[in-house]
Amino acid sequence: NYQQYKSTAFVSQTGTAMLGWVVPATYQYSGQGSYQQGQKLARERLVSALQRDQLEKLPASPFENSSYRANIGKEILFEFGFLNILKAWVTGSAINLFAPSVAFSPALRSMEHPSFYETKGSGIVEKLFNYIKNSSGFLYLFILAIGTIISVIFIMLVLIGVFKMILILSPIKVATILILLGYFLIVTGPIVGVKYRLPIEPLLIMFASYAILNWKKIN
């Protein structure tokens, strides 16, 4: 990358991800409007930035292009404010933690269903309501409902496991694991999808297993 484009960046998709995913998702999950409105906002700000900087088009270099888009995305996020960003990040993390793993199953995805990202709604509650309302397949919704219940039980076991570990194990060990878990949640932010939970699945399973083992010892 440095030899061809004089860039030390590893990838040239940061700007696209920022304007195409992070900004719209933050806009939506902070309760400011729908995902589609967030996408429109990002496009309009890109056009106005080009006019402001007196540019006819984006830089030819993919890395300069990405950097330009990313900077616009950062400007928009700063305008949203810390509380809106925090709300969007917490909401996105909660969705990724509680979303049923079966949602990413090829068999389930092959069933007729609406796109979660394309479903309109200002905020997660309205979006989920519209998603359920627009889903015509009973079997699809039934499987998702069962999967969600299992996910909720699993996360409850995880929380119990964390609490038990804090009481018994070294605080440094538990803190290190929680920091690692938190890192992946922060990096993912408001971008939702079951696949983004994969890096932390081993940690979640460890906490849940610890809770079950403690329950077995007591009984």
Regions found by a protein language model. Name each.
Residues 4-5, 98-102, 167-168, 191-192, ...:
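Short helix-capping/hinge motifs at transmembrane helix termini and TM-loop junctions
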Residues 9-120:
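Membrane-proximal stem/loop segments at transmembrane-domain junctions that anchor or position
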Residues 80-83, 87-180:
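Membrane-interface anchor segments at the N-terminal boundary of transmembrane helices
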Residues 149-150, 194-212:
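Hydrophobic/aromatic-rich transmembrane helices and adjacent perimembrane loops
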Residues 163-173, 208-219:
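Membrane-interface junctions at the ends of membrane-embedded or membrane-associated helices
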